Amino acid sequence: MGDLPGSGSTAQPRDAAVTGTGGNSTAGGGSSVGSTAVDRPPSPARLSHTSEKHPKVTLTELNMLRRHRELCDVVLNVGGRKIFAHRVILSACSSYFCAMFTGELEESRQTEVTIRDIDENAMELLIDFCYTAHIIVEESNVQTLLPAACLLQLVEIQDICCEFLKRQLDPTNCLGIRAFADTHSCRELLRIADKFTQHNFQEVMESEEFLLLPVGQLVDIICSDELNVRSEEQVFNAVMSWLKYNVAERRQHLAQVLQHVRLPLLSPKFLVGTVGSDLLVRSDEACRDLVDEAKNYLLLPQERPLMQGPRTRPRKPTRRGEVLFAVGGWCSGDAIASVERFDPQTNDWKMVAPMSKRRCGVGVAVLNDLLYAVGGHDGQSYLNSIERYDPQTNQWSCDVAPTTSCRTSVGVAVLDGFLYAVGGQDGVQCLNHVERYDPKENKWSKVAPMTTRRLGVAVAVLGGFLYAIGGSDGQCPLNTVERYDPRHNKWVAVSPMSTRRKHLGCAVFNNYIYAVGGRDDCMELSSAERYNPLTNTWSPIVAMTSRRSGVGLAVVNGQLYAVGGFDGSAYLKTIEVYDPETNQWRLCGCMNYRRLGGGVGVMRAPQTENYMWCENSFKQPNS
């Protein structure tokens, strides 16, 4: 509105109307007399307004009319239940009803319409949604809601049902969900169920659902190149388990199914001793031909280029080839030297050779197929020593040059063939020092320091940059992030995280940087977020199942694993894996040791079994 008067004087608005003659009117003793109109802003030419309450209020009132059966112009007869409604509302929400009521169908002229092949409870929930925009999808109703939503062409409800089923996937039900998705043409759900089935085939093949599969669906599954198996023996064993579940009806399909088992990829011993000697296989001529084909492939290596086909093509399981190492950490009141290896293919943790020193707060990275353990704290002293592990020999060597500073709670990563050590603390102060190791020269050299001192910092490499994420400046946890450009030897700040985090886990996954867990000013965290370098923004993802400070984070064969940590009351040995398709974490086993502040590294699986460590060859603390 108008300006407020100031300093006790009275200001006359410029638009005030003044009465009198000539603009100055004098009366009586020469006093000035005037009349001032009320001050108003100029009238706008138009005033636009959109009510945020109107849609909700209108729907609420329409729903009240429906419930009181007022102004309803159609009754839906579903399974003997009568549902009163308004044609215009149903037509606006559903293409099915729009076609029914606006076309030339007989129903367009009827006041009572019978709807067949739909569950009455599902119909009532969907009509409620049309009037309220609210629905609850749960295990007890999703199998009737989804078909009903498909029939009524309520795409939003279809998507919600599919999202719910995606979150329910596990090895015991994924085949049923896959079939359900296929029946109702839910392509995205079918794709994800297929992917889940392929990825978890070793567990799926043990389920009752697998034994009940129709032959066509079995073939669809086992013919996939993406089937995740340790060897083709597992596929053959799965097929024979399925066959023997109902031999009388299924033996006629054996050759049809066996042609999708890649027999030429079996070991000669298994092919001859197990497949070739099986009575069901031997009794079928087409099956015998498949076995002979595989024998020829194995016996005539010089002819193999001429024998290539679908059965000679190795499968490409997403998990094959990489293993995760958990290194050092804090357990049972002391730093530990133990190291263990996780194989996602078998879901097993195995002990390997321990380091020569106990190390908590150790930085771990893989360079040239060798695992480096940098610095840390041995329970008494801060360390600058380095150890290097060779998985082929299962041995640690200590001939790596030490860092120029002692460092624990240090971030370590590999960029352009150099090993970088970032931040940490040396027992006196929190560090912003950064140095890098040249394996050809066996030498460390300093590069530009960070702009902020950081201990408990997480580091990641993406797009040719080295990122330093969170940590603590020695006083409080940080949410700031900076990145190093090796071309200009310079650190630059980027967008901060939404949460302050020290001792967090960090990894690059699908071109995002994921930051999980850690500790803020008050407590250990389960929350997680990810950074998009293209938009320079952080966005939240679903929280982990446990709070985890001092957690390790790594990508193994295309899956993101969170390893160990501290939940505020106990050291953890559990691990969990993140599925970006469903935005869910799930627990997937335990390490042999509880580990806080251990390092993690990912390597190609060794070619031999010489890396296995005898678990009783050294004393283990309580795990």
Swiss-Prot record:
Probable substrate-specific adapter of an E3 ubiquitin-protein ligase complex which mediates the ubiquitination and subsequent proteasomal degradation of target proteins. May have a role in synapse differentiation and growth. InterPro entries: BACK (IPR011705), BTB-kelch_protein (IPR017096), BTB/POZ_dom (IPR000210), Gal_Oxase/kelch_b-propeller (IPR011043), Kelch-typ_b-propeller (IPR015915), Kelch_1 (IPR006652), SKP1/BTB/POZ_sf (IPR011333). Residues 20-32 have a biased composition (Gly residues). Disruption phenotype: Defects in synapse differentiation and growth; undergrowth resulting in reduced numbers of boutons and/or branches. Residues 174-276 form the BACK domain. Keywords: Actin-binding, Kelch repeat, Phosphoprotein, Repeat, Ubl conjugation pathway. SUPFAM superfamilies: Galactose oxidase, central domain, Kelch motif, POZ domain. Pathway: Protein modification; protein ubiquitination. One of its GO terms (cellular component) is Cul3-RING ubiquitin ligase complex. Disulfide bonds: none annotated. One of its GO terms (molecular function) is actin binding. It comes from Drosophila melanogaster. Pfam families: BACK, BTB, Kelch_1, Kelch_KLHDC2_KLHL20_DRC7. Transmembrane segments: none annotated. Residues 72-139 form the BTB domain. Residues 1-54 are annotated as: Disordered. GO terms for biological process: negative regulation of synaptic assembly at neuromuscular junction; proteasome-mediated ubiquitin-dependent protein catabolic process; protein ubiquitination. Kelch repeats lie at residues 323-369, 371-417, 418-464, 466-511, 513-558, 559-605. PROSITE patterns: BTB (PS50097). This is Kelch-like protein diablo.
